[in-house]
Amino acid sequence: MSTPTPLSYKDAGVDIDAGNALVSNIKAAVKRTRRPEVMGNLGGFGALCELPTKYKQPVLVSGTDGVGTKLRLAIDYKKHDTVGIDLVAMCVNDLIVQGAEPLFFLDYYATGKLDVETATSVVNGIGEGCFQSGCALIGGETAEMPGMYEGEDYDLAGFCVGVVEKADIIDGSKVAAGDALIALASSGPHSNGYSLVRKVLEVSQADPQQDLNGKPLIQHLLEPTKIYVKSLLKLIEASDVHAMAHITGGGFWENIPRVLPENCKAVIQGDSWQWPAVFNWLMENGNIAEYEMYRTFNCGVGMIVALPADKVDAALALLAAEGEQAWLIGAIAPREGNEEQVEIL
C-alpha cells in the first residue's frame, strides 16, 4: 500500500498566507479610522470599544446590510475600490436616521478563492467609508470557501453599531402636519434596484460604456453611495429634526411611511427637483412606469428630513455649507382614513 500524498489546507483551496497578506495590506486603512474609544488592535478574538463619555444615557443602535447585486456589476467591470464605501453607507445612513453617531463597523467578505489584490481594494473602500462617517473599522471576517462561489465572485455584508443620547432619539413621534420635508441629493442609484438595472442593461442591449452626460453609463451606475452622517449630525445639533427617511429598497412608497405617525402623510412635489440623467435613462430604456421608478429607486433623493417649516431656510443653508445639495421637496399633511401615506404630485 502506497503512502498517500500529504495534504494541506492550501491543497483544499484555503490559503492562510493570502489571508495574512490581506491583513497586512489593510492595516493602514484600519488605523485611519481609529476612534479614541477603541481598545486594542486589529486581530483579536473580539473587538473592544468604550462608549463616548459625552453621553449621559447612551443607547446603542445597530444595523446590518449588504450591497446587493450592484456587486455583480462591480465584479464584471472590475470596479472593486468603491463597493466598500457602498457597504458602509448602507449601514451608517440607516443609523443616522435615528440620530445615532456611528461608533464602529465590522465587515464580512466571502469568496471561493481569495484574491489579495481585489480584497485589499474592497477593504480599503470600507476604510474610506468608515473615515467619511467617523466610524472605526474595528474588525471583520474574511471567509475563503472553495466550492461556495464561482470564479472571482465574492459577497459582502456589513455590521455597524452607533450611539445616541436616549432623550435625543429620532423616531418620528414628533412629526406633525405642517412640517416641511427637505430632500438631500443622492449620488446615483446608491445600492438599490440593481437587479432591475441589470435587467434593463440586458433587455436594451445597451453599451455600458456609452456616454451619458459626459461620462460612461457604467460610471453613473457604479457611483458609490453618498454618506450623509457628518452633515446630518450637524443638522441634528443645530435644528429640530422630527424624522429622517433613508430612501433605499422600496423607494419613496415604502421608506417614508416607516417614520411617519399613522395620522400623517407626506405630500411631495414631484417637480421640485430634477431627476439625474441615469434615472431617466433607466426609465426610458426599461420602459419602467413612474410608480415603479419611485418604488425601486431613489430617483435622485437619498435622504428626506422632516422638520418645522420655520427651520427650512437655516437647514438648507447649513446643508449647503456642508457640501450637500438639498431642497424643499414637500410637507406633512393630515391623513384621512386609509389614505396612502405618500403622495407625489
Curated annotation (Swiss-Prot):
**What Pfam families has UniProt attached to this entry?**
AIRS, AIRS_C
- Print the keywords alphabetically: ATP-binding, Cytoplasm, Ligase, Nucleotide-binding, Purine biosynthesis
Q: In which pathway does it act?
A: Purine metabolism; IMP biosynthesis via de novo pathway; 5-amino-1-(5-phospho-D-ribosyl)imidazole from N(2)-formyl-N(1)-(5-phospho-D-ribosyl)glycinamide: step 2/2
CDD domains per the UniProt record, alphabetical = PurM (cd02196)
Give the EC number: 6.3.3.1
One annotated GO molecular function is: phosphoribosylamine-glycine ligase activity
Query: Single Gene Ontology BP term?
Result: 'de novo' IMP biosynthetic process
Q: Which reaction does it catalyse?
A: 2-formamido-N(1)-(5-O-phospho-beta-D-ribosyl)acetamidine + ATP = 5-amino-1-(5-phospho-beta-D-ribosyl)imidazole + ADP + phosphate + H(+)
Compartments, as annotated in UniProt = Cytoplasm
Q: Please report which protein family the annotation says this sequence is part of.
A: Belongs to the AIR synthase family.
Which HAMAP family did the record assign?
A: AIRS
Q: What is this protein called?
A: Phosphoribosylformylglycinamidine cyclo-ligase
Originating species: Shewanella sp. (strain MR-7)
